[in-house]
From Swiss-Prot:
One annotated GO molecular function: protein serine/threonine phosphatase activity
UniProt keyword annotation of Signal present: no
Protein name stated in the entry: Serine/threonine-protein phosphatase PP1 isozyme 1
Record CDD domains: MPP_PP1_PPKL (cd07414)
């Protein structure tokens, strides 16, 4: 307990416990409403969430060492109502431990509520709630795909810059019980030793190439043996052989990543040696995909909880 209190102090030195609880309560106010409304937080409150969480991210390693049981979630992309449904399903923190694999902002309507709730939980439960960086937690990307516009419309550009400083400190990978390696995108041709991840500098922007870029951008591909060109125009694709080779070299069981919409919310690759998890159902209102969350128990058994896409009213354009 002492360690937990100490950790909480570190983040909450910048934000009082009562204030933090009030922010969380306001963010959860509409959790049972049919439609999720905008939550009114002040600019000062949001800034304090950014700076307090930033401190915690930097105190914790870039490659997190986590213990099960834990629930792993993929892309959320501003679909705040669906984030609340995930918590309804899996248990609101601290009922369960969580690891999110990045891409909290952009595309969806409520990136601000989404990222604010996640940062607030990080500050309140620093040892039970974990957030990794996705390729959208990067200024050059979320400047274009919606988050910048949402910050500017609801607050100002200075607040968007405050989030950028926070995102530049997010950890980039997690290792569960030394057996399950988690990141947003995938493997990298330059990754031979996990210390390379531990030693990546922070704060940092996401470069156009190299290890950090690959961890956030690469994709598995059934069409490729070895490394291939990525249609995204960034990073690489990697074949099943590269997954098997990596796991064997590092005595691991599974690579767990997000970054791609998959129809059932989760999808295995390379004979179940890699899994993609995507947690935004009806992504952008354009896909008919389910969302999923992977539960890892103490014995590293993985099971999936599914958010069906059809819990929605039909959309008429």
């Amino acid at each position: 307990m002492a360690q937990n209190n100490e950790q909480q102090q570190q983040g909450q030195g910048l934000i009082e416990a009562g204030v933090l609880d009030d922010i969380i309560n306001r963010l959860l106010e509409f959790r049972n409403a049919r439609t999720v409304r905008q939550v009114q937080l002040s600019e000062a409150e949001i800034r304090s969430l950014c700076s307090a969480s930033r401190e915690i991210f930097l105190q914790q390693p870039n490659l997190l060492d986590l213990k099960p049981p834990i629930k792993i979630c993929g892309d959320i992309h501003g679909q705040y109502g669906d984030l609340l449904r995930l918590f309804e399903y899996g248990g609101f923190p601290p009922e369960a431990n969580y690891l999110f694999l990045g891409d909290y902002v952009d595309r969806g309507k409520q990136s601000l509520e989404t990222i604010c709730l996640l940062l607030a939980y990080k500050i309140k439960y620093p040892e039970n709630f974990f957030l990794l960086r996705g390729n959208h937690e990067c200024a050059s990307i979320n400047r274009i795909y919606g988050f910048y516009d949402e910050c500017k419309r609801r607050f100002n550009v200075k607040l968007w810059k405050c989030f950028t400083e926070c995102f530049n400190c997010l950890p980039v990978a997690a290792l569960i019980d030394e057996k399950i390696l988690c990141m947003h995108g995938g493997l990298s041709p330059v990754l031979t030793n996990l210390d390379q991840i531990r030693n990546l500098p922070r704060p940092t922007d996401v470069p156009d190439s190299g290890l950090l870029c690959d961890l956030l951008w690469s994709d598995p591909s059934r069409e490729v043996k070895g490394w291939g060109m990525n249609d995204r125009g960034v990073s690489y694709t990697f074949g099943p052989d590269k997954v098997a080779e990596f796991l064997m070299q590092h005595d691991m069981d599974l690579v767990c990543r997000a970054h791609q919409v998959v129809e059932d919310g989760y999808e295995f690759f390379a004979e179940r040696q890699l899994v993609t998890i995507f947690s935004a159902p009806n992504y952008c209102g354009e896909f008919d995909n389910a969302g999923a969350m992977m539960s890892v128990d103490e014995s590293l058994m993985c099971s999936f909880q599914i958010l069906k896409p059809t819990d929605r009213k039909p959309r008429f354009l």
